[in-house]
Amino acid sequence: MDREEALERLRSARVGRLATVTPEDRPHVVPFVFAVVERDLDVIAYWVVDRKPKRTERLQRLRNLERNPGAELVVDGYDEDWRALWWVRASGSGRVVEDASDERGAALSALAAKYPQYASDPPSGPVVAIDIERISGWRARLEAPS
């Protein structure tokens, strides 16, 4: 899979898995919704702490990124026909976006454009950016084996 196909699959994915590193150097993986924004040569995946039920807005993934900004996100397509399988992995650095910034507004707009729930009930929690540094992907052969 080339970079453009990987980016398109990343942009169109409805849900992904976000991996961060805990203070104990253990992986912490959670499902999350996100929007990809491209500016010049930069690719950024944004997510926001929204109103879905949570114990706190100070999520483990936020604490992890404050300590170690390394992050990886994965999206994939599963099919019982394994010739249609694919995945995309994007690695980068996470950061909390400033509350009063233009970037926050752009991120929330991108999220609302992708997820109607955010348009009707705008989230007020922290916005997080993953500045993507590497993207790769794989897909199975679509043709039947001979």
Task: Report residues per predicted region.
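Residues at secondary-structure transition points
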Residues: 1, 56-60, 83, 102
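Short, basic/aromatic recognition patches
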Residues: 1-17
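Short amphipathic alpha-helical segments and helix-helix/interface helices
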Residues: 6-7, 59-62
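Short beta-strand segments
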Residues: 14-54, 73-76, 86
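Intrinsically disordered, low-complexity coil segments
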Residues: 37-44, 55-57, 99-106, 145
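Short coil-to-beta transition motif at edge beta-strands of beta-rich domains
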Residues: 68-70
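Charged, gly/pro-rich active-site loop segments
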Residues: 78-146
